[in-house]
Amino acid sequence: MHNKRVYDISIALERIKNYCALQDRCQWDVLQKLNEWGLQQATKDHILELLITDKFVDEERFAVSFSRGKFRIKNWGKRKITNELKRKQISIICINIGLNEIDNNEYKKVLEKLFHQKNNILKDKNHFTRKTKIANFLTQRGFESNLVWDKIRELSDK
């Protein structure tokens, strides 16, 4: 039902306000939804302008909540968060504001926790293979490779 075409701007505006009220949305998310509904470009621009004016859509707020959520819930690193925000066409300024919400000490604790989780799962006896697999896992999670290798060296020496 939610993906049916919408022909009335007032209905579209109410539906998109409900969509934005569920969780923070960025302009890209809203435009994707409006495109699904088959609205004309002028109508989409007008609706988006109203949503921004009424604070239903706020790129900075979105970047902050997205960064916090992906880090705390999914344990994503800053690189993966940055790439996803860029994919959603968020400005670099807003991305940096969002990433600054992540506490560096907490970031390092999560990195160490993921290191230990992966290390406990691996069955390889070869230390080189083991370190490489851990590094690949952590960089795929979006952690910076210099931090990953520093942590691997630090924890492997123990």
Language model region names:
Residues 1-158:
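An alpha-helical, amphipathic repeat domain used for nucleic-acid recognition
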